[in-house]
């Protein structure tokens, strides 16, 4: 198993931005594994049943992946923030696809907190702690509730990944 994404040429940026990317529906197309309930919510049991190596490796990259690569090469600090419970298979896929990152923040095992509350809580320190407070931040996600939650933290730019990707599909 490959344990780290192959490195590419990367600019040493003295004033990097913090670029935060969701995975599913943002950088990765995992829609073939999704089933929704009648009310539109995610069928989590179906999702977990389809988190096998065979199913995960059928996922594909979305156009926003290239923005992530560009941000990484420009020396920005790349954070992957996902509501997935990350597994070894997920990491293997991320590394095999060349998805560059400096930090991954994911759902703790067994945590059932709604996505936008979880992500806001997990990312809050980038807005509150002194070393990060005055650094420019960008947040990319396809979920409107997540965008609103992160936007409520204050200064930063949020991008609707669904709209972004649809421009290029």
Kindly give the residue locations of the regions a language model identified.
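Secondary-structure boundary/capping motif
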Residues: 71-73, 119, 162-163
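Conserved Lys-Pro-Asp/Glu-containing loop-to-beta segment of HAD-superfamily phosphomonoesterases
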Residues: 17, 119-144
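Structural alpha-beta junctions
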Residues: 74, 99-104, 130-133, 152-160
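Short, aromatic/basic amphipathic alpha-helical patches
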Residues: 91-98, 126, 148-155
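Acidic, Mg2+-coordinating phosphoryl-transfer loop and its flanking beta/alpha structural elements
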Residues: 134-169
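Alpha-helical substrate-recognition element adjacent to the catalytic core
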Residues: 2-113
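Residues in intrinsically disordered, low-complexity segments of regulatory proteins
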Residues: 46-48, 126, 163
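Short, charged, surface-exposed secondary-structure boundary motifs
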Residues: 112-117, 167-169
């Amino acid at each position: 198993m490959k344990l780290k994404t192959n490195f590419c040429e990367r600019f040493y940026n003295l004033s990097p931005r913090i670029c935060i990317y969701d995975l599913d529906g943002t950088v990765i197309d995992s829609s073939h594994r999704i089933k929704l309930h009648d009310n539109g919510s995610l069928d989590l049991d179906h999702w977990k049943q389809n988190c096998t190596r065979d199913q995960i490796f059928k996922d594909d990259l979305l156009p926003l992946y290239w923005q992530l690569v560009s941000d990484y090469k420009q020396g920005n600090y790349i954070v992957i923030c996902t509501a997935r419970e990350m597994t070894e298979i997920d990491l293997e896929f991320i590394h095999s696809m060349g998805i560059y990152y400096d930090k991954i923040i994911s759902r703790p095992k067994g945590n059932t907190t709604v996505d936008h509350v979880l992500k806001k809580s997990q990312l809050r320190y980038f807005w509150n702690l002194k070393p990060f407070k005055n650094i420019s931040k960008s947040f990319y996600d396809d979920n409107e509730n997540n965008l609103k939650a992160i936007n409520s933290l204050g200064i930063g730019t949020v991008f609707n990944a669904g709209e972004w990707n649809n421009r290029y599909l």
